[in-house]
Amino acid sequence: NCCIPAPEPAVDCKIPPDSVMKGKHGRRTQESIDRANELLDKFVKTLEGRGIKVDRPTPLKFDEKIATPDWEVEHMFGCMPSRDVIITVGKEMLEATMSFRCRWFEYLAYRPLLQKYFIEDPGMRHETAPKPRLTDKDYHMNYLSEDVSIEQRLKWAEKKYFVTTEEEPLFDAADILRFGKDLIVQHGFTTNLKGIDWLTRHFPDHRIHTVNFPGDPYPIHIDATFTPIRPGLILNNPVRKLPQEQRKLFEDNGWEIVYAAQPAHNSPPDLSYYSVWLSMNVLVLDPCLLYTSDAADD
């Protein structure tokens, strides 16, 4: 039941004016859903073949209307990667606030697994961040204008002016990278400064470092921008470079930052929210083995 999201403040600003997704929303085609499930099933078998136990979320009725006392949207998004919704730090699994209305209830797909882990492991901690109301006060509505050029969006990104306001704490788990006792958090569309402040208070035994990438006019999640692939080595998107003053933290601690190769594709698939830089979104199994999509350059 995966869907193309209906219009809402956090979603609209992500869709470029020339995208074929403009004006389209609703349940994705059965063909695309079946193909995605086929790829997922194949990947699960690959991981299980390496002795890895794979747990999968419980689907919801993503194509039905959802609402809170403050808003309603025609349907949900779908069940995206668990790392969007949940950040695991030691024995704790923390549900993020999320910043898209269509993803507000997505955590429910993972609740059966979280309950299972809680029962099986006496040391497991299941935590949830305060759910935001996501009223219009949470968004800069001028971000919705189709008249805003990419050049203007880049200027806004450089000034750290994003679609989300500081009305209440907001963060997606996919904006967080874990480096032992250091957590790197991207400030952008889906995580605001109040969200980073909340994380700082919640993890007092960790050091929280805020980063941003001025070259990204749509800064949603850090995975296709800044990716650690083994101890001491990080891939950085050459279009979304980490500012020089923020590189110092990594370089002073022995981390080399290298720019990723150009993706094999020049444009993302139709009806896709992802950029060609999805090639950087890899799964690292160990320091010598990682999995990437076919968007990567050989």
Please identify what each model-predicted range represents.
Residues 1-298:
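The feature marks the mature, well-folded catalytic cores of soluble enzymes
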